[in-house]
Regions:
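Conserved NAD+-utilizing ADP-ribose enzyme module
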Residues: 2-31, 35, 81-206
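Short N-terminal edge-element motif at the start of the domain
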Residues: 13-63
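Short, surface-exposed beta-edge/turn micro-motifs
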Residues: 37-40, 64-68, 74, 126-128
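Short, flexible beta-strand-to-coil junctions
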Residues: 43-49, 72, 133-137
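Small-side-chain structural scaffolding
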Residues: 44-45, 70, 77, 151
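Extended catalytic/binding region for NAD+/ADP-ribose chemistry, centered on the ART fold
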Residues: 62-86
Length: 206
């Protein structure tokens, strides 16, 4: 893994302290669940000015009814990237899967995320906004675990700025890899039998 600097997350007061950052990370990414569902869900954006979220049809799924989309804490690391950055991830949900992940990918982490090397400089410079919502306003989406939808206009409870994307992965103990092309690692993830997710792959280098 690359040597990473300490993550910085800030709100409208400016850069916050390490203790405040740790509390934000604990609150946001180890969110408690009620009856198997999270208390809070999240949306990540490069736009920090969104006051309310209006249902829309996602370009990647034009047959889906208009909805506001959010994710739980387990899915969050998939979105600690610049929006257009192709990225892939594989992870373990239990002890058996962890043993397989460790064997196949030579890691001690429970999740691996990977992106193309050409995105490393942008990862260092970029910042994104984390919008937090009350999960009771959403319903689980049947298409994927950890994703939630609402047909209503939703106002976020809070928004934070994440200005160290590399540091967020490090703080969450996510192994972050960079490779010139994702194809071979994608094939290994597909063949692993483990949970995986690919995002913005249509923009990946061929």
């Amino acid at each position: 893994m690359l040597p990473l600097r300490s993550p910085h997350v800030r709100d409208n007061r400016g850069v916050i302290t390490d203790a405040e950052r740790a509390e934000l990370f604990r609150r946001a990414h180890a969110a408690p669940k009620v009856h198997g569902r999270p208390d809070v869900v999240f949306h990540y954006s490069e736009d920090g000015t969104i006051k309310r979220f209006t249902p829309h049809v996602p370009p990647s799924n034009p047959s889906h009814p208009p909805a506001v989309w959010a994710i739980d804490a387990e899915r969050a690391p998939l979105y600690w990237f610049p929006r257009r950055c192709p990225r892939i991830s594989v992870w373990a949900n239990d002890g058996d899967q962890q043993a397989r992940l460790s064997e196949l990918f030579q890691t001690e982490a429970s999740r691996i995320c990977a992106a193309e090397t050409i995105w490393l400089d942008e990862m260092r410079r970029a910042h994104i906004y984390q919008y937090r919502f009350d999960a009771s306003q959403f319903a689980p989406w049947a298409g994927a675990d950890g994703e939630y939808i609402s047909g209503d206009v939703i106002q976020p409870d809070h928004v934070d700025v994440i200005d160290d994307l590399l540091g967020m992965h490090a703080a969450a103990e996510v192994e972050l890899r960079f490779t010139p092309r994702l194809g071979r690692l994608m094939d290994e993830m597909l063949a692993s039998g483990l949970p995986f997710s690919f995002v913005r792959i249509r923009d990946a280098r061929r």
